[in-house]
Structures are given as C-alpha cells and as structure tokens.
Swiss-Prot record:
Cofactor binding note from Swiss-Prot or TrEMBL: Reduced FMN (FMNH(2)).
Pfam families xrefs: Chorismate_synt
Source organism (scientific name): Rhodopseudomonas palustris (strain ATCC BAA-98 / CGA009)
A cellular component annotation (GO) from this entry: cytosol
Any one GO molecular-function label of the UniProt entry: chorismate synthase activity
Protein name: Chorismate synthase
InterPro entries in the cross-refs: Chorismate_synth, Chorismate_synth_AroC_sf, Chorismate_synthase_CS
Quaternary assembly: Homotetramer.
Xref: Gene3D superfamilies: Chorismate synthase AroC
Binding site for NADP(+): R48, R54
Amino acid sequence: MSFNTFGHLFRVTTFGESHGVAIGCVVDGCPPLIPLTEADIQGDLDRRRPGQSRFTTQRQEADQVKILSGVMVHPETGVQVTTGTPIALLIENTDQRSKDYSDIQNKFRPGHADFTYEAKYGIRDYRGGGRSSARETASRVAAGAIARKVIAGMTVRGALVQIGPHKIDRDKWDWDEIGNNPFFCPDKDKAAFYADYLDGIRKSGSSIGAVVEIVAEGVPAGLGAPIYAKLDGDLAAALMSINAVKGVEIGDGFASAELTGEQNADEMRTGNHGPAFLSNHAGGILGGISTGQPVVARFAVKPTSSILTPRKTVDRTGHDTEILTKGRHDPCVGIRAVPVGEAMVACVLADHLLRHRGQVGG
C-alpha cells in the first residue's frame, strides 16, 4: 500500500492498523531547535482520545505517545528541542477486541472500505478496519501537535457546527464553550440539545453525520501558490483524506453559488496595516494564496456504517447475505473529527509556511 505520506517540506508518514500492536507517524522536515516534549503532543491526543463520553466509542485507549527520535536536550539550555532529523512517534494499541469482528471477516460491511480494499489488494484487515479505521487519525493528531509548533503565532481551532440536520446558532458562537461539552460545540444551548439527540441515536443502535468547521487565525498573507499548489487545494485534499469525510468547502463554499457578485466579493478599504477586508466570504484565500484573513474550512462527516441494524450485503464468495456489526463504535464520528481536522490544517499550514520561506524568504 502506497500513499501513506502527505506534505512537501513538512512531511508526515503514518503507519499501523486499528488492531495492530501500535500506530504512529514519522514527521520529516521539522526545523531544528523547536522545544518539543511528549507532553506537548499528549494534550492534543487527549482531546481526540476515545471513551471519554457516552457519545463516542467506548474503546479505552490511553494514547500515550512516545518520541523515538528527532529530539535531544540542548547542551546549553537544558531544554529538549528538535534536531531537524525525522521525528518518530509511537502510540501503542492496548484495547483491541478482534473477536468482535470474527463474524464479518468474510462479509463486506456496507458503507465501509471493506469491498474496495479487497477489490484493490485482494485482502483486507477486517479487524476494526485496519488502515481505514479512524484509529489511524491519532497519528495525524500527534503530527499536528508538532505542526502547531512550526506555525507559532497562528491559531488553529475547530468546532462541531452541525449534527444531522441540526445546526448551531452562529450568533451564540463562543470559543470558550468548546471545552465545556463533549461535542466541541461553541453553542451552549445546542450542546445540550445534541446530548439528548445523540442519546436517542445511540440507544437505537444507529449513527448520524456531522459538519466540522476549522478556523485558522494569524495566517499571514502570501501562503500558497497559484494553480497546482493552492493553499485551499491542499487543505481540501488534507481534510478529504480524513476517514468518513465526504465533502469540503472553503469560506462560504457551496453557499457562494447562491450569491451575486456584489454579495460575494470581499470589499477592501485602507487599514492601519495595509488593506482591510470588509467581509470574508473567501475564507481567507484568494487565487490559492492566503489573504491574511482567518482561513475557514468546513467538512462533512458521514454517519458511520457500523450500526446495529441488519443490512443487506454480499460475502467474499459473491453470495447475498445480511450483516450485523458488533464492536464499539462512535454514534457520531464527527465529534472526534474536530481535533483531527485541526491537526490536518496545522500540518498544511506548516508545510506551506516552509515552502513560502524556501521560495521567497522571510
């Protein structure tokens, strides 16, 4: 299997399977002399960690990260810093229950990657989905914690803005509420509604989709390049690579199709530090290059297909059958996708920052 690496100068390679011994990543291209400890990474991993509420999978993983290479204690300052060499990170799997999947080893789960992996490789890891499992995203979050160090001065934050058909009230958006509920929801009232709503979904054995919004502030103007190296193009690819993501938009996205030119164009006036934009329909990117405004992206997460309702499918021999998925699964995978989306945006920004410096300096 190829294509386990993304990025150009800030490159991330992830490895491992859901029910394997461990997962992890190698981050290549991180500049030297950046202070970095396991604690710097652990905080982000803890936000994504499963089993923290009844609204996520009950798989219990500590997700304790180990830095295997790429850092050392600076001989003069006594601070552990990056050396500029590849940074290898390891996260052990400790709560696999492969027996929960024995009944489906010869059946394709509808809506999962079972059939397509089998069609391409002639084999698939049925134990929790292998590489196609959301378990893989812990490695991305670990890499994203390093990327945040590279883009010091920029802030990348995410929020759950919709579950099923139910959207938050944007007039009630409060970033301080994100850590006060299990949904990463910025709307206090909607978070309470989501709790009741997801309880019903969970108890019925079903699942539901969601929309996540990522906002990056402090992004300088000039990141990205025209045509084939657009910042928004790389962001879209990075976010689309997350498990279960089926749609990505930048700025107003698909809603811009309903606007006139007068409504959509972000007008400008002279400000204290250069041009000041009067709106941000473009999501902080024009012509593939950042404008200096907040970079805004949203992605849609489909409902997981691992549900307790029997579904029609076929087996590996081509016979019709039914399947009932056992195991522990998220009723709404969009919840834990929030820190994953933040990590992917941070990695893309780190990559583009280094590419920008390499091309034009600064």
